Regions:
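Mature catalytic domains of secreted/periplasmic carbohydrate-active enzymes
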Residues: 1-261
Length: 261
């Protein structure tokens, strides 16, 4: 009541029978109070503690392998070995976290990222560096993340993501053929999870084929641009895919903004 939390996060054990009556009371009170506050809120849970559809299912340190028709969440930490500040933490590279974020959002999920402060409340230089790098990327590519929704398919490419929790320590060796898709209005965002040195990209989900051949998209591609640069890429489209050539490069994922019609 004092702080009006936007998220009420539960960890494990609450799926036990002894906790069930209290979960219902907590949810009813929280949701009713949120309605009085006129705020959108969420309850995060694990292990089927809540009935499906009444709260947000959470996967700890892991992801979904495929797109889901319902909203879900991943919770993980900047460090692989700890949730709190620890000397000599094994910090995850910002690029790896960004790839996970993009993959999660493309599958109808959200990322809850933990940062462990020191005892005096300050954030370590290592944490700050990772957060700053993520923020810099979001400044350029946030349009493909915020206020978007899933497309017809979450993406394409050879690299598979392990389904389930406690797998974020498994290195995902994404390639320049791995794309994740998000959408908004008449725009498709195709995010390449790794930059190709030659600047050439081929999005096979946008190939031109007959409806009998399992085509993902039958409409028109009006334009293609790259977030972060004013230089227009060269692009063509045929029965093998949408082919893009750009001089823009980065050490993190890049986003193609594709206008559809």
């Amino acid at each position: 009541d004092r702080y009006h939390p936007q998220i009420l996060y539960f960890d494990w054990w609450i799926q036990q029978e002894a906790a069930k009556p209290y979960l219902k009371k907590a949810a009813a009170y929280y949701y009713n109070r949120a309605a009085e506050w006129n705020e959108e809120v969420a309850i995060d849970y694990k292990f089927d503690a809540y009935m499906f559809g009444t709260a947000v299912p959470d996967i700890e340190r892991g992801q979904m392998a495929d797109i889901k028709p319902y909203f879900w969440q991943t919770d993980t930490a900047i460090a692989l070995n700890s949730w709190c500040y620890t000397e000599n933490n094994d910090f995850r590279p910002a690029g790896d976290i960004i790839c996970d974020l993009v993959d999660i959002v493309s599958k109808n999920g959200a990322l809850l990222l933990n940062v462990g402060p020191k005892a005096d409340g300050t954030i370590s230089d290592e944490d700050t560096a990772v957060l700053t790098a993520i923020g810099d990327w979001m400044q350029v590519n946030g349009e493909a993340i915020y206020d978007t929704h899933v497309w017809r398919t979450f993406g394409e490419g050879p690299t598979k993501v392990q389904d389930g929790g406690f797998s974020d320590g498994v290195k995902k060796n994404f390639t320049g053929e791995d794309f994740r898709f998000t959408a908004k209005d008449d725009t498709l965002f195709a995010i390449a999870l790794k930059v190709n040195d030659n600047g050439e990209y081929h999005i096979r989900s946008l190939r031109m084929q007959e409806h009998t051949a399992g085509t993902v998209y039958h409409g028109l591609v009006e334009s293609v641009s790259v977030l972060g640069t004013d230089d227009a890429p060269v692009w063509t489209r045929d029965e093998n895919g949408l082919h893009i050539k750009t001089n823009y490069t980065s050490d993190k994922p890049i986003t193609f903004k594709i206008k559809l019609n």
